[in-house]
């Protein structure tokens, strides 16, 4: 029977391999410091009352290389345990008119693995042409779809990123759809239909949004969901990847679980020896492009208590 450490490592391999195998554009992404807050990403304290999906603030931003109107948005959402949080994202509306039937549809895009540092937030990377999800955004805009890309909980905004938590990610997707419906002054068509899209971590997010929509956001006009390679069958990856180039990414999974459920943080971290706890601390500062230098080729036996 797999140990808790082995199960955590299994999850880590899935989230690490998918975006890199998918052909990510590693264009000089920022690394290191996780102190990537600026004024936009600091939510009101206390968070004002309201409903999930309410827009807390929005501002126009530059969309490099895109023929689109871009709006950065902060919106209200819920974490894995139902607590109110603020999440950020970006909404893109193409300049070209919609040639299909009815109002222009909106695709809510769940990004693949980004990392854990606040500087890894997709809305920050997209501003500098360092976001590999442009590989999906560009063709969607070319077809006339509006695209809304979430940063997820804890990327850019204060607090940890609950990596691979389907509830948090599903809520972030659904609440961005709600927020987008309020941006008719920024090009979103009234009566827009909603679709979900994502690969890897984003595939999990797209599937989670589709699964949760009926109970969490039944009012949304959801018509489709595309979920590519969501983390699912993990055993083979665990066997093949223990001690691989990307093995240090287990820190993202452990830190993500602790961010979603802080009451188990001490127990989780107790499974790691001092070297392992150092890996966890540094993992909170890394983006996905840093993965090859996150203790590559370290077998889990080197940094866990039980091996």
Named regions from a protein language model:
Residues 80, 112-117, 153-157, 201-203, ...:
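Solvent-exposed loop/turn segments at secondary-structure junctions
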Residues 178-248:
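Primarily recognizes the serine-hydrolase "nucleophile elbow" in alpha/beta-hydrolase
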Residues 1-29:
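Secretory targeting and sorting signals
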Residues 27-102:
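Catalytic-loop region of hydrolases
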Residues 163-185:
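Alpha/beta-hydrolase active-site loop
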Residues 80-144, 151:
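Short, surface-exposed "cap/lid" segments of acyl-processing enzymes
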Residues 103-106, 142-148, 191-194, 220-224:
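Loop/turn elements at helix/coil->beta-strand transitions in domains of secreted/extracellular proteins
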Residues 45, 228-307:
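Accessory cap/linker subdomain of secreted extracellular hydrolases
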């Amino acid at each position: 029977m797999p140990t808790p450490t082995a199960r955590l490592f299994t999850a880590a391999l899935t989230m690490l391999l998918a975006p890199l195998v998918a052909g990510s554009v590693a264009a000089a992404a920022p690394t290191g410091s996780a102190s990537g807050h600026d004024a936009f990403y600091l939510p009101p304290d206390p968070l004002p009352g309201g409903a999930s999906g309410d827009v807390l603030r929005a501002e126009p931003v530059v969309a490099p290389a895109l023929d689109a109107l871009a709006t950065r948005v902060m919106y209200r959402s819920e974490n894995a345990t139902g607590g109110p949080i603020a999440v950020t994202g970006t909404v893109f509306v193409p300049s070209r008119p919609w040639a299909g039937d009815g109002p222009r549809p909106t695709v809510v895009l769940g990004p693949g693995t980004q990392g854990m540092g606040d500087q890894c937030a997709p809305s920050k990377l997209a501003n500098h042409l360092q976001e590999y999800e442009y590989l999906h955004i560009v063709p969607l805009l070319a077809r006339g779809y509006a695209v809304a890309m979430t940063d997820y909980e804890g990327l850019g905004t204060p607090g940890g990123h609950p990596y691979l938590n389907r509830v948090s990610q599903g809520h972030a997707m659904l609440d961005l759809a709600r927020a987008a419906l309020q941006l008719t002054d920024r090009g979103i068509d009234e009566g827009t239909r909603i679709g979900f899209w994502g690969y890897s971590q984003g595939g999990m997010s797209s599937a989670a949004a589709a699964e949760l929509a009926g109970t969490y956001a039944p009012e949304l006009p959801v018509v489709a969901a595309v979920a590519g390679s969501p983390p699912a069958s993990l055993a083979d990856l665990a066997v093949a990847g223990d001690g691989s180039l990307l093995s240090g990414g287990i820190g993202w999974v452990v830190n993500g679980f602790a961010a979603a459920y802080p009451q188990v943080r001490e127990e989780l971290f107790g499974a790691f020896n001092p070297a392992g706890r150092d890996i966890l601390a540094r993992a909170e500062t890394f983006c996905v492009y840093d993965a090859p230098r996150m203790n590559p080729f370290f077998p889990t036996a080197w940094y866990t208590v039980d091996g």
